Amino acid sequence: MAKFIYKMQNILDIKLKLEDQARTAYGNAVTKLEEEQKILNRIEDRKAGYENQLSELMSASLEVGEILRIENAIEIMNFKAEEQRLEVMRAERAVEKAREKLKEAMVERKIHEKLREKAFENFKQEISAQEKKEVDELVSYKYTSRAGSEEV
């Protein structure tokens, strides 16, 4: 029996590699987003800690220098939190972009796999037709051989 050789197998292989790369890039983007969100959470936690310290200082004694230091720290945390929110947004956009590339790569791979399946089905039909033709020829040959030998 003839062996099936898909003429565009190298393209399918490339599409598989591109999909793997897109999947890796998506995973990296998700990891980066998670890291950025953790950083933002730590900043928010530090800010909350400073705010608790400030409320304790305000209710206890009036240490103006310490109060100003903590208020300044809260402002710095607000600034850092805002910057980190921007980083989180960038990371979210990168995740979305990577998701779209992965989706596109998966669609392209599936298209080429369908083409390969259709080519394989055509190949099987051709082989079947060829085998049927050979059987018909063999039967026809045997019939004509028998008919010819009976006439003698």
Give the ranges of each region predicted by the language model.
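Charge-rich amphipathic alpha-helical interaction elements
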Residues: 1-152
